[in-house]
């Protein structure tokens, strides 16, 4: 196992690829918007697509969102515009009891205390590898990943965490990229169990 610091340049990327080609598991980091951005960053560094598709197994992305303060949490009904901005319909959440922090001494009257991570994990199956080899655009790779691997976006993971009472739509909107259309809430909740 080889753990590299952040891959910032072509030399480091080539080193990681060469190590992977010789059978080593290589773990590293990128600063990108999402999982597809990690693949595109390698392509931008002029790493050949056949090397990317033959060595990369998966790409993970994460963001930290503020967590609702458990000491001052209270039920609330979100505004329709707030729900629509995350890609849901108001009917999806009308009968749910969502939570929001009122603000207290513990959370410095913000309504939030601590952090919670939202994740996105892209597993490179054959369909995704073929899309990379064909140099398909990011939105096509994302669509293929969503359809064939069940890729859940960070935004969708965040929505599930709102429904489960950990954070708010406001946090999800401010901290996660909108990378594709949000699936129906029922499907998101099934995929994030």
List the predicted regions and their residue ranges:
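Short, flexible helix-loop junctions that flank or precede catalytic/ligand sites
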Residues: 1-193
């Amino acid at each position: 196992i080889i753990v590299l610091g952040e891959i910032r340049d072509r030399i480091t990327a080539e080193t990681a690829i060469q190590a992977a080609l010789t059978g080593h598991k290589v773990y590293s980091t990128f600063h990108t918007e999402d999982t597809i951005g990690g693949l595109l960053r390698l392509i931008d560094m002029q790493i050949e697509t056949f090397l990317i598709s033959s060595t990369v197994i998966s790409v993970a992305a994460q963001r930290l969102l503020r967590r609702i303060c458990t000491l001052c949490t209270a039920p609330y009904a979100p505004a329709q515009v707030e729900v629509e901005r995350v890609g849901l319909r108001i009917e999806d959440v009308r009968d749910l009891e969502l939570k929001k922090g009122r603000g207290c001494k513990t959370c410095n009257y913000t309504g939030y205390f601590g952090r919670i991570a939202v994740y996105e994990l892209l597993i490179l199956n054959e369909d995704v590898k073929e899309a990379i080899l064909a140099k398909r655009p990011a939105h096509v790779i994302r669509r293929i990943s969503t359809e064939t691997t069940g890729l859940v976006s960070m935004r969708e993971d965040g929505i599930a965490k709102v429904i489960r009472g950990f954070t708010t739509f406001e946090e999800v909107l401010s901290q996660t990229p909108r990378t594709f259309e949000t699936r129906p809430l029922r499907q998101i909740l099934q995929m994030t169990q």
